[in-house]
A protein has these predicted regions:
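Mature catalytic domains of secreted/periplasmic carbohydrate-active enzymes
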Residues: 22-461
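Bacterial N-terminal signal peptides that target proteins for export
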Residues: 1-7
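Bacterial N-terminal signal peptides
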Residues: 9-17
Length: 461
């Protein structure tokens, strides 16, 4: 149903004049984070984008095991570097997969914990230019993203097993043997590599890993690296560097409840696997469409990792996931891009987003047929499904909005309704806040993604 025919369904609405007599209790919209160095416009654009794609790929893929974490002997692990010469790496093809998925930004793992650098760096000889491949992957992918209008971001591990001269990857902080050259060296080394990624490759996002290193958060390392970022690219946004320097919080494989400030969830098409092996098991696209739906209703972004194979190609199964997600977003993207979560808190059945006076209701496949939303202080003017021509069944009374979406209307993916109200939607409807933690399922089974409660206001800095 197009906008011109919206008015045709308004006659189906029933409303009570007294429904708006007393405004509902709402929580006011919260400000953006108060870090004085944050570029607010850049962070707003990030929040508008809602979906990003990540790529883990490097010589370690030849081991057919997880990157870094499979390292039990550094010499054996690093011996594969001399054989790395993939035949089918094409940065344009990678960018095309991100574009097909509906992503607006790309984050590439330029250096994982193993310390191997996928760019032409002056900081170490442990880099891609000293392999038979001898191509600057970061440069090629940055250029491909620019051509496709994708924001380019760079993942950089603070932990560097090669530079730290450790013999293996340590999963527990208590097992780590310390740093031969001390934390100041790690901070300087990380800052120098950060400067290269910002100035040579126009990185717009610095996405760190390894801030859990023993002593890192207690050192001046985060502040030292932040100073480089703010000087070299003040518009770049930062996450996972540690302490109070981050512009937003990113959580791994956890769906947060609603949070007023920007946040991100990162997971993989083959979670818990992030780099390619021949035993990978993929989740279906419907799983990630539902994940994206839950995340955006909680006012967050989803960063979805894809895993190119040893030859540099993205396997067909992953391309199918990207195409299916992109197809859903093509039909429902106006409920995702540029919107904000709320004004209803996410629940087991789904949640809502809004933009101006437009309320988008995300109804998950396993939701009950009928939902009741408490009064939001606005009168319903018109409504439609984003993907069906049938007029929705929605009524408005003193009790709020009653939304009925029969299962024969729904498919295997989230169904979205657009409800146009008589004024802009602001704040959160307190009556919709779940009284107990939300227990979620995905595709009818308990999700391996855990609910995590987040503060609803910006953290004190």
């Amino acid at each position: 149903m197009n906008r011109k025919t919206m008015a045709a369904v308004t006659a189906m609405l029933t409303s009570s004049a007294s429904a708006l007599a007393a405004p509902p209790a709402t929580t006011p919209d919260q400000p953006m984070p108060v870090n004085p160095h944050t570029d607010r416009a850049a962070l707003q654009r990030f929040a508008d984008d809602r979906l990003g794609v990540m790529f883990h790929w490097g010589p370690a893929v030849l081991r057919n095991q997880e990157i870094s974490w499979s390292m039990s002997d550094r010499a054996k692990y690093e011996s594969v570097y001399k054989d790395f010469n993939p035949k089918h790496f094409d940065a344009n093809a990678w960018a095309a997969v991100a574009k097909a998925a509906g992503a607006k930004y790309v984050v590439y793992v330029c250096k994982h914990h193993d310390g191997f650098c996928m760019w032409d760096t002056r900081t170490t000889t442990n880099n891609i230019m000293n392999t038979p491949f001898h191509r600057d992957v970061v440069a090629e992918l940055s250029a491909a993203c620019a051509r496709d209008g994708l924001m380019f971001g760079t993942y950089l591990s603070i932990m560097d097993i090669h530079e730290d001269k450790w013999n293996r990857c340590y999963a527990a902080r208590t097992q780590m043997p310390g740093y031969p050259q001390g934390l100041p060296h790690i901070a300087t080394f990380t800052a120098d590599q950060t400067a290269e990624l910002l100035t040579k490759y126009n990185s717009q996002m610095m996405w760190y890993d390894g801030a859990w290193l023993q002593g890192w958060r207690q050192s001046d390392g985060p502040a030292k690296v932040e100073a480089v970022i703010r000087a070299d690219n003040p518009k770049a946004i930062i996450t996972r560097l540690g302490n109070d320097v981050d512009d937003y919080e990113c959580m791994e494989a956890r769906i947060g409840t609603y949070r007023a400030v920007p946040w991100e969830m990162v997971t993989s098409v083959a979670y818990p696997t992030y780099s390619f092996n021949t035993h990978i098991k993929y989740k279906p696209a419907s799983f990630f469409i539902e994940t994206l739906s839950r995340v955006v209703c909680g006012n967050g972004n989803l960063l979805l990792n894809f895993v190119p194979d040893a030859d540099g190609a993205i396997p067909p199964e992953q391309q199918t996931i990207a195409a299916d997600m992109g197809g859903w977003l093509k039909a429902n993207g106006e409920a995702v891009y540029g919107t904000r979560g709320g004004p209803y808190y996410p629940n087991t059945w789904g949640g809502t987003t809004h933009e101006g006076n437009r309320l988008f209701v995300f109804v998950l496949p396993d939701a009950p047929d009928t939902l009741t939303l408490p009064p939001c202080g606005r009168k319903l003017v018109s409504l439609r499904y984003l993907t069906h021509i049938e007029p929705p069944n929605v009524t408005q009374t003193d009790a709020g909005l009653t939304v009925t979406v029969p299962k024969d209307i729904r498919g295997s993916d989230t169904t979205v309704l657009e409800l146009t109200m008589d004024g802009d939607l602001t704040g959160m409807v307190e009556a919709s806040r779940p009284k107990t933690p939300v227990k979620i399922k995905q595709n009818g089974v308990p999700a391996p993604i855990e609910e995590r409660t987040l503060p609803t206001t910006a953290p004190a800095r």
